[in-house]
């Protein structure tokens, strides 16, 4: 598996219950492996809670507003291939690790076919070059 941990997985989104969640995470930080959605990321950082992973899927420019604060280098970005490129660039400049995923957008399916099946060497080079997972 990608992550080896005995911790409880906490997937944190921006919800009406987020204040209660923040209290629990602050009281027992060692208990949780935290995956934050992009919409909860800044809020967690404001409370000095550093997620191990932050996930972003949306390619719209407004999504980059969820990443205005300094990015902790230890936080791994899990990004869809259609995610906003400004977010990817910010994590690359920060020398943070990045893992890409495909949520099924039709254009990404074409990209998968071309890149993974026909040009696997290009994909491996891109991962090595940019310190991605």
Language-model features: locations:
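A short, charged/proline- and glycine-enriched loop
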Residues: 2-9
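N-terminal active-site wall of soluble small-molecule enzyme domains
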Residues: 16-29, 43
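Contiguous, well-ordered alpha-helical segments that form the cores/surfaces of helical PPI scaffolds
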Residues: 9, 19-20, 38-46
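Acidic/Gly/His-enriched mid-domain segments of enzyme catalytic cores or analogous surface patches
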Residues: 42-133
């Amino acid at each position: 598996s990608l992550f080896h941990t005995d911790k409880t997985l906490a997937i944190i989104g921006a919800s009406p219950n987020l204040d209660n969640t923040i209290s629990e995470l602050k009281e027992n930080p060692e208990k949780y492996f935290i995956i934050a959605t992009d919409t909860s990321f800044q809020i967690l950082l404001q409370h000095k809670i550093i997620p191990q992973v932050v996930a972003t899927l949306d390619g719209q420019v407004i999504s980059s507003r969820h990443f205005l604060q300094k990015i902790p280098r230890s936080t791994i970005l899990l990004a869809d291939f259609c995610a906003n490129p400004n977010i990817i660039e910010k994590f690359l400049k920060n020398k943070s690790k990045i893992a890409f995923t495909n949520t099924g957008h039709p254009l990404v399916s074409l990209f998968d076919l071309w890149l993974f099946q026909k040009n696997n060497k290009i994909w491996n080079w891109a991962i090595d070059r940019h310190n991605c997972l």
